[in-house]
């Protein structure tokens, strides 16, 4: 089956300063006939228009009005990061600065942003930064009719799905390491609660930043992070309409204004709604969103920016498959992506209410100094409900009930395809991320050496609240209805090779316990960096982040405040030393919170060399601190979090930009982290441990931009050898890590059709190598090729106001396994999406 996506894109209206620039150019043409001749030249007109859309134009536009986003006394793009860049030729301009990697740039018609990494002190291009990054522009998002992050990350071969259910927010991995949902997603460089589907309607681009150092991200997982950049105010009025072959409907509006005598105030609003018709049975839903952005140039030296977005989403989500008996991949020819495992008519949908907001003030100081301050708040409230397909069925006595396999592991499906069905309800999951930061930057020259220095601080607060125990004295209610956390009730069994059958919900109907504090995390960081510019196009960067981490995880205590088995570690209040309930004498020892109180220095060192203007060679070394993972429920140290761990990475790379239209990059990296797995005790039990290491050695190559006048291209390839060693289990040593293919490639092209004005064809292809499903590499899913095809048509040519798009994913309707990742210690298999065809139309007034 096919789904079609069509998007329409119109000419972007000029802002006032751009109109003034154009008029200035016109007024400087001495003869009207000369101007008419110039206008007849499409190339010359295009060059002038592009110039007027960009930064101040020197001879033509230095006196023109500036938009509130780009005051004339500061650079168009901010700065602070370990990613150092060449200094400004004229050292008078004082850059702004941020402590997280973010890429800023203006959209062009070549899929190549004029971008900088935040942390670079002067608004430099991607070519000049000592790190690897991919930027998905607004044009590319439109051409692929993207709605979710899963639509976006397919453009970078270094990114893979890790655990991406239909109807639920997804987990992803970069360079083979899973993103930490607490710290791995950002909006405008500010960390957000990652447990959400971030709307794309108000985003100008999405940045995938790889190999991030602790300087930018503080305490996070290795691999990288994903940053969303919001649209800024502009004079625009546009609408989008879309559908697909399954009956989804979509509408959105994008309106903005520039106000004031010099356009010093701007506002922009995005509104949207969607009725979601999913390819998986009974997982349909809907969503509504509203977003706004405002810029205010308070003075020639100061600008204030603000953003907010809110999304309400309701949708049922489905479960993934598991290995049969822990040793066999299900027969893909007998199962279908449309099947919702364990589907029951009484299953409620998930409900999401997410809110993200931020504010930033930039101020230019005298004598080549600048300062900025920013604050953000992110809120994700989820009613998490799913008919959960997991593990084996059980008999009335609680024993594994697999036909002809009584000893099958309970945490995998039965060898014959039977599985257990659970009523899982976890209402009121509340996650909040709060960030505040301030950075001072300056420019110092000592003889032939130039220093771009930055210093500042950041505070990060995160809290997680979920259902917990009924009372301190009674984890459950006396009638057994109120649980000590989420509802997780076994209700029956099904078989993956048979149609689903109705089963009754548990009786009496259970309810989740009251909301309790599960996690309270604080980070206070001091940031310092010096970027040294030496003669001969050489730069040296040294810096780091001193991070004071105070992370207190109460998840074990919140669901069972006291247990019969002591757990090593500090005993934390509010649970008393001795359980006070006389009617439960077996509960006498505290389950302590998992406390992490650690101060750490996270360095970043880099060097760049530009032998010629079109080439940049770089190398970097960085360290990162990550919080330990959580053990699965079925190991001896069930649900416990392991200690924090360090990750170290070294990277060298080269970037080549033969023109301003295309960028070619390659990078070689080595990342080393501890290896975590459930270790057998030899007596049928397991303990989740950190033993040995996993080393990810990889090569990345990317091409992004306009390869020819008729061809725009986004292509990526990643070859990663991710192996585990010294694990204590010989069968795991020297083996490829689960869910990391040796080779992954992706290509998307935009081909201009000759002789048909405004028509483009957009073919795409991706290849993913074999993925291992077990740690000893004895079970894997095969490699797969996926082909996509789309078209874009703008009646009247590229300057038309309306654009139609059609885009089809997986046009061959290939049935395949998309990932073999893990979630809280358990392994899952997910089927890839079938053919999906979307149609969209965009109109600009």
Predicted regions located by residue number:
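N-terminal Sec signal peptide and the immediately downstream disordered periplasmic leader
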Residues: 2-144, 150-158
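Conserved C-terminal beta-signal and adjacent last beta-strands/turns
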Residues: 48, 429, 441, 453, ...
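Acidic, small-polar-rich N-terminal luminal/periplasmic segments of exported/outer-membrane proteins
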Residues: 97-236, 652
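Outer-membrane beta-barrel translocator/receptor signature
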Residues: 202-204, 215-292, 298-302, 355, ...
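Acidic/polar loop-and-plug regions of large Gram-negative outer-membrane beta-barrel proteins
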Residues: 274-278, 291-297, 301-364, 368, ...
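Structural signature of Gram-negative outer-membrane beta-barrels, strongest in the C-terminal barrel
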Residues: 295-297, 431, 450-462, 517-673, ...
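Membrane-embedded beta-barrel scaffold of Gram-negative outer-membrane proteins
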Residues: 364, 370-376, 380-386, 610-618, ...
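Gram-negative outer-membrane beta-barrel transporters
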Residues: 536-540, 670-672, 689-774, 842-844
